[in-house]
UniProtKB/Swiss-Prot annotation:
Residues 1-21 form the signal peptide. The N-terminal processing sites of the Pol-RFamide peptides are acidic suggesting that cniderian nervous systems may use a variety of unconventional processing procedures. Keywords: Amidation, Cleavage on pair of basic residues, Neuropeptide, Pyrrolidone carboxylic acid, Secreted, Signal. This is Pol-RFamide neuropeptides. Residues 238-257 have a biased composition (Polar residues). Belongs to the FARP (FMRFamide related peptide) family. GO terms for biological process: neuropeptide signaling pathway. Has direct action on motoneurons, and effect includes transient inhibition followed by prolonged excitation. The modification Phenylalanine amide is found at F59, F71, F84, F97, F110, F123, F136, F149, F175, F188, F214, F227. The modification Histidine amide is found at H201. The keyword rRNA-binding does not apply. Residues 229-267 are annotated as: Disordered.
Length: 287
């Protein structure tokens, strides 16, 4: 056998022994490797220094240091840096071969700090806020996790996820049950349609706008379910006709432009105000 064959045989044997590193002590494993190399090179009348030179050219460092770092103890940061292109601590080996991966390794692996809570969440427990922050670029709360994995989602999560108002029907289909009243109450409060849409879009909105926004003509039933009974019970609200079933008034408003609708709204509000008549009462004083 030539020198190259012996070297390949020696390195292959080292790799096989390296797999069993957890079961053998560092000193015993190192001695076995040295004996194998010394035996192979003695038969070829070569010194261990020759192998050092070859391995140095092959791996860029002294063979003894490489063998010690590769098989006799935890891999050094220098070897790992050359092997994986980054700095890895000895703690990485413990995590790699059956022990918990420490924060230092996770920082190098994922480019951020990762706590032990992340590991617990990654392999069967709830993910911590720190992990969610790194994973999704924002602070992930426990409420988000509950909503993500089958429980009610907070109003902040729904707003970030969908960027729009979520109706009862959508929430029912999304989470398999009726959304809590607290959720919708937090989103819409007790505001009527006119005020809510004005705050959200900065203007009064008509049925034409709603049609363009939602792709269909919103019915009284949908509006009633979406905003509750607050507007319906408000007699002074100009949009009350949409909830009371007055189709004539609704059609008249739909065919009018927004400016006329505003004018009519003002007229309606004025007409609904009670008119107080002045009455003079004469009181005769009798002596």
């Amino acid at each position: 056998m030539n020198l190259i064959t012996l070297l390949v045989l020696g390195v292959s044997t080292c790799l096989i022994y390296g797999i069993e590193a957890d079961e053998k002590t560092s000193s015993a494993l190192e001695n076995e490797i040295v004996e194998i190399l010394n035996g192979n090179f003695k038969n070829e009348k070569k010194s261990i220094e020759t192998s050092d030179q070859w391995l140095k050219g092959r791996f860029g460092r002294e063979v003894n240091q490489w063998l010690k770092g590769r098989f006799g103890r935890e891999l050094s940061d220098q070897w790992l840096k050359g092997r994986f292109g980054r700095e890895l601590s000895d703690q990485w080996l413990k995590g790699r071969f059956g022990r918990e991966v420490l924060d230092q390794w996770l920082k190098g692996r994922f480019g951020r700090d990762a706590s032990n809570q992340w590991l617990k969440g990654r392999f069967g427990r709830e993910l911590s806020d720190q992990w969610l922050k790194g994973r999704f670029g924002r602070e992930g709360s426990n409420q988000w996790l509950k909503g993500r994995f089958g429980r009610e989602a907070s109003k902040n999560d729904l707003e970030k996820q969908n960027g729009r108002g979520d109706s009862d029907q959508w929430l029912k289909g999304r989470f398999g049950r009726e959304a809590r009243k607290q959720l919708l109450g937090g989103r819409f409060g007790r505001k009527d349609m006119n005020q809510l849409l004005a705050e959200r879009h900065g203007r009064e909105t008509s049925d034409q706008w709603l049609k363009g926004r939602f792709g269909r003509q919103l019915s009284d039933q949908w509006l009633k379910g979406r905003f509750g009974r607050e507007v319906k019970n408000d007699k002074n609200n100009p949009f009350r006709s949409r909830y009371t079933g007055d189709s004539t008034q609704l059609q008249r408003e739909n065919n009018q432009p927004i400016e006329e609708l505003r004018d009519n709204t003002e007229k309606v509000s004025i007409e609904n105000k009670p008119i107080m008549k002045k009455t003079s009462v004469k009181i005769s004083k009798t002596v």
